[in-house]
Amino acid sequence: MKKTNSLYVSSPVNALVKGILREDKTLKEVLEHGDFGLGTFNDLDGEMVLWDGVFYDLHSDGKTNVADINLETPYACVTHFKPETSVIVDEELTFDTLKKKIDSLFLSKNLIYAIQVTGKFKSIKARSVPKQEAYRPLVDVAGDQKEFFFEEEEGTLVGFWTPDFMHSVTVPDYHLHFISDDKQRGGHLLEFLSSKVEIKIQPIEQLNLDLPHSIEYLTAGLDEDISDDLDKAEH
């Protein structure tokens, strides 16, 4: 029997959207569930990439560093990356045309997909946010985001595609973070233009969701539809 691929989510994304920006889940604990993924750190102090078993902190100035394994996260999505499809695209792609290319590789839009895109990028537009005060809604935090541009980079996009019906659990549609090959630059992907890339995808059929036990989480009102706020914050 084929072993089922699983996505681990450390906390529902709707908690993050509502301003619960701190939890006691360490990166070391998250690493038990995968070697590939993304997320953020407590107080939204940088974007996160987990790639090849190493966590990176993508700061609000576009610079990156290896993250301390004892740091904590309010939201992380990880998997053990075992790609089943690989395609080389030797032509220019934008974010929109990349989405169409990857869409054509999906088995079904009722599954989750881990996505890695590695290669040469003519330009990258990305963002991150500076450290925040607790309990600030994510849509308000988005106003503080810092955008930056990289040119003629070689690097990797790391992330997931998730069905819309899961929007209270994790970020729906495409959610990708960029990190340069030298691990010095990165951020939450907004736009790009590539010249040659290799796309690898992995279908995921199982979800492993942790529900925090913090007072903030247990007493939060999480029944509201957060899809509009999440879309504004992520795009």
Go through the PLM ranges and name each one.
Residues 20-24, 46-49, 205-235:
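Intrinsically disordered, low-complexity terminal/linker regions enriched in Pro/Ser/Gly
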Residues 171-179:
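Histidine-centered divalent-metal-coordination microenvironment in nucleic-acid enzymes
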Residues 58-59, 125-126, 168, 186-188:
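Short helix/loop capping segments that flank catalytic or ligand/cofactor-binding pockets
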Residues 96-160, 167-169:
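Long, positively charged binding patches that form subdomain-scale interaction surfaces
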Residues 180-222:
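A hydrophobic, small-residue-rich beta->alpha segment in the mid-to-C-terminal subdomain
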